[in-house]
Every structure is written in structure tokens, then in C-alpha cells.
Amino acid sequence: MTAAYANLFSTIAPKDFGRVAVLFGGLSAEREVSLKSGNAVLTALQSAGVDAFGIDVGADILQRLLSEKIDRAFIILHGRGGEDGSMQGLLEVAGIPYTGSGILASALAMDKLRTKQVWHTLGIPTPRHAVLRSEADCISAATELGFPLIVKPAHEGSSIGMAKVSSASELIDAWKAASTYDSQVLVEQWIHGPEFTIATLRDQVLPPIALGTPHTFYDYDAKYIANDTQYRIPCGLDAAKEKELMDLTAQACEALGIAGWGRADVMQDADGKFWFLEVNTAPGMTDHSLVPMAAKAAGLDFQQLVLAILAASVDADGKKEARG
């Protein structure tokens, strides 16, 4: 552990967190990942002595929240219904403190188009893009942006529904496929160069991780299944570029109102410029996940990490107006 990260450790006695509901599963396309993340978090909290129990979130969640004795909630739902502000809203109505970002920041970060609009307004570099609603939009985007491009559902995570395309026909096919996940589909310039992911914890930026994969990009298989994905930490940047990346990450997260914890995904082009893609407000916590890797580099093991995330919910008590 370096002195820079010494204040990340929770100083709260495990029993003082009260009864903690770990919210996982849900109904989104990322349900299976959330189940793995949730079980890992629940096991770590219970091993630390926290009075924690799990809720696999379903249609009865409002009734569960109102009928159970819950002192605070650890949100480890991925995707819609968990990262989009809706669960945060339910918890605020129920008067239950929770981990992570607030309603507005969660909704903004879940919406890739709105995220890009905020960043563009504030001068945070993000790839050029277009919204696809028709085949005509695909042709127009191809002319304006050129190839290759990457197609993304606007409200999905874990790279679900994403595809790299190199022709108009591929773009149209990818738009149709992405439309099965989301009514709003984006297409972005493809940035040639290395990819980085940078976690934040309690308003501090953790050591960046460089990603390497034989896949076309860091897709669902590379994230959760493959054993050939490469992670470099230290990330290989020189000190000045690493500081630039970490400073930009802090600005990008602050622009969206990210609180508690999160993870930004960034590309670097051939000229060394960084391009911000998105921020995850409840990132994965599986054995393949990136936030635990970054936390380990900062000196926190998995149990210490989940306690630090939970402690941030205490930091936010009574400060809901300051949350995003």
C-alpha cells in the first residue's frame, strides 16, 4: 500500500454497518455476471463480520425493501434496473442508504449518448458518434465517420450487443442486432490503440490497468470467460501520461457526478491522446473483474475493497443532495 491510498480503508466496525442487503441478479442482460459479483461481495462481507444477506432482485423488490429490516444496501446489480437510477430511486423512497452513485449520475452514466453529450460540452475527449434509427442513418454515419466503426446499444453494459464493422452492410447488420437489446443504438469512431480501464474509489483514482486481448475488442468473452486476456498493472505509460490519464478520469467522473466507486473505460490513439468511452457505476466484482485488480495494486484485498465501498455509503448518509 502507498500512502496515497491509506485513507481508502474503512475504519467502521463491521457490526456498525447494521443489516446490509446485497442487491444482485436482477432482470437485465447482465444478470449472470451480477449473480457472480453479488455472491462474491456477499461472501466477503459475511467473512468480515458484517450482518449481510442477499436479495436476488425481481418484480417483488419494492415489497422486499419495505418489509425487510435493512440498514443499508450494497448495489451490485449490473445494467438496467440497477445502474440506471431506478434502484437508487427506490432506495431513496424507502429511506435506505446505498452504495455508489445517486439517481442522476447513475442514469447519466448508463446512457452512453447522454454521457458523451456531457463530456463533449465540458471538453472531455470522447470519440465522434452518431445515433442510428434507420438504414439511412447507417449510410449517413458511414459517410460522416468513415470505417472502422463500433456499434453499441446505448443502455447496455458488459459489451453486450457491441460489434466492430468495416463496411456499410456490416454496419446495417450490427445496427439491427444491437436494436434487439435497445431502441437507441450508437455508432462510434473506432480508436486504434491500447485500451485502459481506471477505477475510482471514494473520490480517488486507482492505478490504471492496460488491457490486451486477441479478441477484436474487449468483449463479453474477454471480460468474463477467456483466460487469454492480458492485464498490465503498472499500465506501461510513463509517469506524465499516467498522471494525465488519472487526472482526466477524475474530471470525467466528476462531470457525471460519480460517487462511491466506478470504473472508466478509455482508449489511447496513435498520437497518445486519450478518448473516454464510458463509466460503469456498479462494475463487475467477479474473479475476472478489473476493480479488484486495481484495488489490489493500491494495497486493498477484496474484503477491504468491499468494506471501503460500503463505508462510502456511510459517507453519503444525509448528503443525498450532493450525490449525482
UniProtKB/Swiss-Prot annotation:
ATP binds at residues 142-197. It comes from the Bacteria. Binds 2 magnesium or manganese ions per subunit. GO terms for cellular component: cytosol. It catalyses: 2 D-alanine + ATP = D-alanyl-D-alanine + ADP + phosphate + H(+). Mg(2+) 2 binds at residues 278, 280. Pathway: Cell wall biogenesis; peptidoglycan biosynthesis. Residues 116-311 form the ATP-grasp domain. GO terms for biological process: cell wall organization; peptidoglycan biosynthetic process; regulation of cell shape. Belongs to the D-alanine--D-alanine ligase family. Cell wall formation. This is D-alanine--D-alanine ligase. The lineage of its organism: Bacteria, Pseudomonadati, Pseudomonadota, Gammaproteobacteria, Pseudomonadales. The gene is ddl.
